[in-house]
Amino acid sequence: MPADKICVARIGAPHGVRGAVKLWPFTADPLAVLDYGPLSTKDGKRSFEVETAREAKGHLVATLQGVVSREDAERLNGVELYIDRAQLPPPEEGEYYHADLIGLAAVDAAGAPIGKVLAIHNFGAGDIIEIAPPSGPTLLLPFTNAVVPTVDIASGRVVIELPAEIEGDDPAQADI
């Protein structure tokens, strides 16, 4: 079931001495965070209006209404900013909101369980799907059509085609 709030950005470290912050957007268009109006914490207790934003290397430099000093900005480092899901357009064909994928069952092509989707990461070279198997370490796999050929949100599952180097791994048989 889709989350009713979607995280669209995270406040980072201060930028300068006048209250500006580094803002790490999670939207396809980084400046889209300006279009959603006030952004709130997940619990809705605090709200932030982005007054200005400009693109920097991998993030935005933003000013938030009421944040006027470096000390104010430092206190916000790490705060995640959310909007109501209803504010987002529906995803296009073949695109998904990360929040909709978290918690889905991961199965192989035969339907055998592999685990659950724990997270979607992007370390700069494309999306990575993290799967938590019933036991053992989590799997980090490329989120590509070859590895994840089927995403069925309505059925609550993703089909995973494990790459041969993972599928065939057997630590007990490893050469020493």
Curated annotation (Swiss-Prot):
Keyword Transferase on entry: no
Listed GO biological process terms: ribosomal small subunit biogenesis; rRNA processing
Key word rRNA processing present: yes
One Gene Ontology cellular component: cytoplasm
InterPro entries membership: PRC_barrel-like_sf, PRC_RimM, RimM, RimM_N, RimM_N_sf, Transl_B-barrel_sf
Subcellular compartments: Cytoplasm
Domain PRC barrel: 93-166
Pfam family of the protein (one): RimM
GO molecular function: ribosome binding
First-listed, main subcellular location of the protein, grouped into a coarse class: cytoplasm
Residues spanning the signal sequence: none
Keywords from the named record: Chaperone, Cytoplasm, Ribosome biogenesis, rRNA processing
Family membership noted in the UniProt record: Belongs to the RimM family.
Functional summary from the UniProt entry: An accessory protein needed during the final step in the assembly of 30S ribosomal subunit, possibly for assembly of the head region. Essential for efficient processing of 16S rRNA. May be needed both before and after RbfA during the maturation of 16S rRNA. It has affinity for free ribosomal 30S subunits but not for 70S ribosomes.
Record remark: domains: The PRC barrel domain binds ribosomal protein uS19.
Oligomeric and partner information: Binds ribosomal protein uS19.
Full protein name: Ribosome maturation factor RimM
